Amino acid sequence: MSKFENVSVAKKANVYFDGACVSHSIEFPDGTAKSVGVILPATLTFGTTAPEVMELVEGHCRVTLPGADAPVTFRGGESFEVPADSEFTIEVLETVHYVCHYG
């Protein structure tokens, strides 16, 4: 799916890491929340409160997931899961366009 229908979008962007990651929160009619955004080339560590599925729409990165000894490479069209109350490190090699699915 290349677009979401019938959603509410927060006008103000979520800006993290001095602008290296910018996203917008969206809410579906059933209350489901997601964020859509971009991460510019950088190495960043994110914390989670809820479980997340990071869907890469486009881009190229290496991700070190909780408990992993080495990073795993992901490209557009792939996704990875992150447990609640954890951290992951992402090394963006080519700007990543993503959808973050919560819960």
From Swiss-Prot:
Keywords: Glycosyltransferase, Transferase. Coiled coil: none annotated. It catalyses: a purine D-ribonucleoside + phosphate = a purine nucleobase + alpha-D-ribose 1-phosphate; adenosine + phosphate = alpha-D-ribose 1-phosphate + adenine; cytidine + phosphate = cytosine + alpha-D-ribose 1-phosphate; guanosine + phosphate = alpha-D-ribose 1-phosphate + guanine. InterPro entries: Ppnp (IPR009664), RmlC-like_jellyroll (IPR014710), RmlC_Cupin_sf (IPR011051). It comes from the Bacteria. Its EC number is 2.4.2.1, 2.4.2.2. GO terms for cellular component: cytosol. GO terms for molecular function: guanosine phosphorylase activity; purine-nucleoside phosphorylase activity; thymidine phosphorylase activity; uridine phosphorylase activity. It holds the Pfam family Ppnp. Catalyzes the phosphorolysis of diverse nucleosides, yielding D-ribose 1-phosphate and the respective free bases. Can use uridine, adenosine, guanosine, cytidine, thymidine, inosine and xanthosine as substrates. Also catalyzes the reverse reactions. Belongs to the nucleoside phosphorylase PpnP family. HAMAP family: Nucleos_phosphorylase_PpnP. PANTHER family: PYRIMIDINE/PURINE NUCLEOSIDE PHOSPHORYLASE, PYRIMIDINE_PURINE NUCLEOSIDE PHOSPHORYLASE. This is Pyrimidine/purine nucleoside phosphorylase. The lineage of its organism: Bacteria, Bacillati, Actinomycetota, Actinomycetes, Mycobacteriales.
